[in-house]
Amino acid sequence: MPDLEVRRLGRTEMRPKALGLGGGHLGDPERTDEEAVTAIRGAIDMGINFIDTSPYYGVSEPRVGLALSGGWREKVYLQTKVGSHPRYLRDFSKEATTWSLENSFKQLKTDYVDSVSIHGPRYDIDAPLGACLDVLVDWKAKGRIGHIAIGVRQQEFHRRAIETGEIDIVLTFFDYTLLSQSIAETTIPLALENDVGIILGSPLAASLLAGPEPEFQGAIEDVSNSDGTLTPSAVGGPTDPDAIPYAHRMWEWCEDRGLNIRDLAMQFVLNAPVEGNGIVLTGSANLRQFEEVYASATTDVPEAVWQDFESEFGIRI
C-alpha cells in the first residue's frame, strides 16, 4: 500500500500531502459540529495537511475554525475563498472582497490564511481579475494571506488568470477524472510552464465514481448553450448527460472483476501529469467517508487491471 507523497504546490513552496480535504460537505447543517470536527481532526491525524473551505459551504468555515482551535491550525495549510459569500455572491468589488475576507478570518478564528481563492466567476473574468485581485494582492503584501488562487472551470479563465502573474494556484474540478481529462493539454501544461500550483477537485465526480452504483436521475435539466454545447460547469460532472452512462459502464466493468471503481478513480487522479506540482482535493461529510477515500488513494491497482481498463476505455495511469 503506497503512502501519500508530499507534493510541491507550484511556486508557493507549500508542501502539502498529495490529498487534501475539501470542506464543501462539512458545512451541511443537517450534520453536527462534532461530526465535522471529528472528520477534520481525523484527517489531520492521518497526515492530511491541506484544508479547503468557503463561505459558500454553509457553516463550513466556523466548523473548520472550531476544528483548528487548540493548536490544530499550525498543523495545516488553510485555504478559503472570496466571491461566494451568500451576502455578496459573485460580487468581486473591493468592498465585497474586503468584507468577505474579514468575515472569513473571523469565522476561521485565524489572523492568517495560507491561500485565498477567487471562487467561481461564471461569465466574466475581468471583474474578478480587477478590484478583487487588487485586494488580494494588497493583503498578500501585508502578510495576511500567503498566496492567491482561482477556482473556476473555464480554461480561458485559467489562462487569463495565470497571465496576470499574480495567481499562484489554479483550482478546478471535474476536469481531470476517469470521466473527463479536459485540462490535460491546456491548463496543466500552462500552469507547469508558469510554476503555478494545481488543485484537482472532485476526483470522484460528485460521487459518480465513489463506489455505489451510479444512479440514473431521469431527465436532466438543460445544461446546454444556445449552440448546443454543454456549459463549462456541466462537462464531466453529474449534470453532463453523458457522464452517468459512462460512469455506469466503468462501474459495471469493475463490478464484474471484483474491483472498486473508487480505487481506480483516486489512483488515476493522483497520477495526473502535474509533475509533482499539484494535489487532489476531495470532499467528505464525515470521517468514515474520508477514511474510505484515503484507503482508495493508498491502494495499489495492479498493472494488469490498468492494461485491461485501457483496452476498454482508452485511459490509464
Indicate where each model-derived feature is located:
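N-terminal binding-site loop/beta-alpha segment at the start of enzyme catalytic domains
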Residues: 1-76
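Conserved, mostly hydrophobic/aromatic
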Residues: 9, 21, 36, 51, ...
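Active-site mouth loops of central-metabolism enzymes
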Residues: 22-34, 82-98, 125
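Active-site beta-loop-alpha junctions enriched in small/polar residues
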Residues: 24-26, 54-56, 81-85, 118-121, ...
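Glycine-enriched alpha-helix->loop->beta-strand junction motifs that scaffold or abut catalytic
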Residues: 74, 163-171, 192-198, 274-278
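Aromatic-lined glycan-binding groove of carbohydrate-active enzymes
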Residues: 182-223
